Structures are given as structure tokens and as C-alpha cells.
């Protein structure tokens, strides 16, 4: 299941709770066409990679998180491990998303 995170406190808690697991964060918005296109694929990754934590953040609902993470465009995918950001890219690129998951998990 993809976790929906609504504020910075919740985001920090998710990073801490994940420990050494990879966290993949999808920063998106309801009005963003490319975000809507990649969303089903992002959600399908949960089944394929059960040891990875998947988080979705709506930048309009959680502006504090988007600002803290320096998100400039949507969709932006950030990858965290051991409470540290290890990778980031922007754009609805399915291949790039799955390659990064495989690389960092």
C-alpha cells in the first residue's frame, strides 16, 4: 500500500521508521497530467517490491514537505535510505523509476 503523507512531522516519522529500507517518495498534484499518468505504475510497484516503502505526497496538501524537500516540479521522485536522500529525478519516466528502485533497494 502506498502511504499518503500530509505534513512534515509525518514525513520525518516515516523516514525514521523505515530504518534501512528504501523509501520512494512521489511528489505530485491532482492537477498534474504526467502525475496522473504514472500514478497507477507507482502503485503497482508496491506489489513488485514489498520491502520498499512507497509514499505519495500531494504538494498542495503538504506544502511544508514539498518546500523542505526542495521540490520544484511534478512529478518528482525522491529516494531515501537510512534517513538520507540517495537519489532524485523529475518526470513521469516508468523505466527510470524502476531502475532507481532496483539500484537503491
From Swiss-Prot:
Major place of residence: nucleus
Pfam families tied to this protein: Thioredoxin
Compartments where found: Nucleus; Cytoplasm; Secreted
Annotated site location: Deprotonates C-terminal active site Cys: 26
Catalytic residues (positions): 32, 35
InterPro entries, per the entry: Thioredoxin, Thioredoxin-like_sf, Thioredoxin_CS, Thioredoxin_domain
GO cellular component, as recorded: cytoplasm; extracellular region; nucleus
Annotated site, Contributes to redox potential value, chain positions: 33-34
Statement: the UniProt record of this protein carries the keyword Ribonucleoprotein: no
S-S bridge residues: 32-35
Thioredoxin domain span: 2-105
Organism domain of life: Eukaryota
GO MF: protein-disulfide reductase activity
Residues with the S-nitrosocysteine modification: 69, 73
Biological role: Participates in various redox reactions through the reversible oxidation of its active center dithiol to a disulfide and catalyzes dithiol-disulfide exchange reactions. Plays a role in the reversible S-nitrosylation of cysteine residues in target proteins, and thereby contributes to the response to intracellular nitric oxide. Nitrosylates the active site Cys of CASP3 in response to nitric oxide (NO), and thereby inhibits caspase-3 activity.
PANTHER family recorded: THIOREDOXIN-LIKE PROTEIN 1
Name used for this protein in its record: Thioredoxin
Origin species: Ophiophagus hannah (King cobra)
Lineage: Eukaryota, Metazoa, Chordata, Craniata, Vertebrata
Amino acid at each position: 500500500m502506498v502511504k499518503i503523507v500530509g505534513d512534515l512531522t509525518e514525513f520525518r516519522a516515516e523516514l525514521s521508521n523505515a530504518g534501512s529500507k528504501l523509501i520512494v517518495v512521489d511528489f505530485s498534484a491532482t492537477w498534474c497530467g504526467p502525475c496522473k499518468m504514472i500514478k497507477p505504475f507507482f502503485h503497482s510497484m508496491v506489489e513488485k517490491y514489498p520491502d520498499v516503502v512507497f509514499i505519495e505526497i500531494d504538494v498542495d496538501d503538504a506544502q511544508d514537505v514539498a518546500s523542505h524537500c526542495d521540490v520544484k516540479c511534478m512529478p518528482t521522485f525522491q529516494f531515501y535510505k537510512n534517513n538520507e536522500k540517495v537519489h532524485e529525478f523529475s518526470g513521469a519516466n516508468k523505466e527510470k523509476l524502476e531502475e532507481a528502485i532496483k539500484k537503491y533497494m
